[in-house]
Amino acid sequence: MSRDVSPLPLICFLLGIPRSGTTLLAHLLQQHPDITAPPEPWLMLALEAFGRVDHRHPAGASLIQVAACEFLGRIDRISVSRVFADAAYSQYLAAAGKRTLIDKTPRYWMVLDYLHSLYPEAPHILLLRNPYAIAASLKSTWGVPFVSERCPPTSVSCLAELVTGTPTAAVALALADLVLGLPALAMQRGRRHTQVVRYERLVERPDEEIQRVIAGLGYDPAGIVFAGVEQTEYLRLSSFGDRRLLKKKAVDNRSVETWRTELTIEEMQTVTDLVGADLLVELGYEQSLQHARDAGIVDRGKAVTERYRRVFQTWWDLRRGEGEGIPAGACEYNSIFQQAEEDNTISSSSSTLGEAQRLPEFKLGENLQLGASMVAQLKRALMASEDDRATQLEALRNRDAAIEALRREVVRLEQSLTK
């Protein structure tokens, strides 16, 4: 089944943001007898975060992180991680009786540099899909809202709401996939050993596209006779992957244009603002952009999209605890506020400040104003949280007092019964 002209890859990474069709593509590729594609291993994300644990860890999250980083800093962490990953992938392949594993994990856009350093020679398959269609799928499948009266486009309140959990982390991450993940993956198109697959062409001509990708991996495309959606039981047994594939009988293109009726004009406007008209055109979706314009949306310019990216990047850096002046491993908002007060400056992320310095239209004063407003809103959120905690503590004390009173009453009744 396999060619002998070049060594076959142990691991291939399938990249694409959530709801772009990665589950379908992985399923079709693993119909080749030498290829397996487990549902979303997330292994690279776990390895990249090695040493960072939940702040509730009883041993102390900051102690674990500092100690692990200190120890790993004395060795070649990348080579050690590579050995672990090779062992994990190899054991999975051996158990499956396959030769190449396709790691399909949509949020690998978050660790692309780590991915490249760990597996610089690994082939990549980059799946691109119309951002409007992705948004429609996020809306219909996960209920992700794209219109919010509480959070006007690119307003400072957006950042404060993101950090304080409104919208929920799941919704914010889904939006970050579009705002940060899509442009990050778009930059991978020219990378060596990268095959680009377009979702629209995949569902129009599945056999042709799968055979092309299989050949690009070094395998004989004749190994796949028909690209169908049978044998999806492995998805039913997993917590990950697109569950809709379980209901499919065949590959079809019905989902390519449904966004035109599923998204409102306001939602199309939001998607255009989040992604940017320039990126839509760059990725080849100018016809979709024109349809949205004909429907009534306007191109608000690069500044709006860049502002969204800065807001989400700042939120993302705060989540990771990597913002400037934020202690390593800090997971509590208290740590953020204390550092901000000590410095009497803005703890905006280094990556965001760097980006602002590179973009003349965004001045440092605007960044400081954005950060100052964010800190003020977060302080108010903290005060509200502390008030809520005080109320809950008072309720607990009242509950404990009531329990103690009941215990005394039980003792009194027991004593009266024994007399």
UniProtKB/Swiss-Prot annotation:
Keywords annotated in UniProt: Nodulation, Plasmid, Transferase
Pfam families: Sulfotransfer_3 (PF13469)
EC nos: 2.8.2.-
A GO molecular-function descriptor: protein-tyrosine sulfotransferase activity
InterPro entries the UniProt entry points to: P-loop_NTPase, TPST-like
Protein task: Required for the formation of sulfated nod factor. Proposed to transfer activated sulfate (PAPS) to the fucose of the nod factor.
Protein name: Nodulation protein NoeE
Organism of origin: Sinorhizobium fredii (strain NBRC 101917 / NGR234)
Gene: noeE
